[in-house]
Curated annotation (Swiss-Prot):
Organism this protein belongs to: Balaenoptera borealis
GO-annotated molecular function: G protein-coupled receptor binding; hormone activity
Record-annotated membrane-spanning stretches: none
PTM sites of type N-acetylserine: S1
Official protein name in the record: Pro-opiomelanocortin
Name of one Pfam family that matches: ACTH_domain
Keyword Acetylation part of the UniProt annotation: yes
Length: 39
């Protein structure tokens, strides 16, 4: 499910995912995948 969202929010959410990684939650997994998309 997040696959399609990544492509859609990969750019706008990419910036918000960076700070989200600070959370000890599973957000790190989401931010880690958003990084390669932007990089």
């Amino acid at each position: 499910s997040y696959s399609m969202e990544h492509f859609r929010w990969g750019k706008p959410v990419g910036k918000k995912r960076r700070p989200v990684k600070v959370y000890p939650n599973g957000a790190e997994d989401e931010s880690a995948e958003a990084f390669p998309l932007e990089f």
